[in-house]
Amino acid sequence: RFYSSSFRTDRGNVAIFSGFPGQPNMSIMKQTNKAAKLPGLPLVLKNEGYMTRFTYGGDSNFTNTRAYMYSCGFEEVVDETGMNLEGHRSKWGYADDIVLDFAADEIIKRIKAEDKPVFDAILTLSSHEPFEVPYERLKTPLLNSFAFTDEQIGRFVEKLRATEEWENMLVILVPD
């Protein structure tokens, strides 16, 4: 069995980072006065000395994501406007191969440059409709996009695993 914290990404992110269940009729992320009062795992980690960053290859202003991520404790929010990358894009933003390569490079760079622990969260988007990915493995666009994201996450983990820092890393994958 698989369980999801919500049926929408904005609600799933709040469940993941603040422990607040996804609401069926509204998104607390869009209600800044309420969202600002929620606890945040990134804030707890920041207070313990972690550098915190949220990376998304799309527009972080969509559904008020940027404001929520800052309010729950991320020190830095990187989205498509701050990446200056080239490559395949869907209507939502950069494809997962581009974003995960960027994120892996940034994580490795930060770990090597700083003497502090790092907490990075990355939101993928290639498995979102309209399921347009630079990849042709399966017949249906939906399953093909899942296979693409799966392969890119594998590449991301392998890139991190190839570093000396791997022994001190923990990679957690969660659905929204």
Question: Where are the model-predicted features located?
Answer:
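Solvent-exposed soluble domains appended to multi-pass membrane proteins
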Residues: 1-176
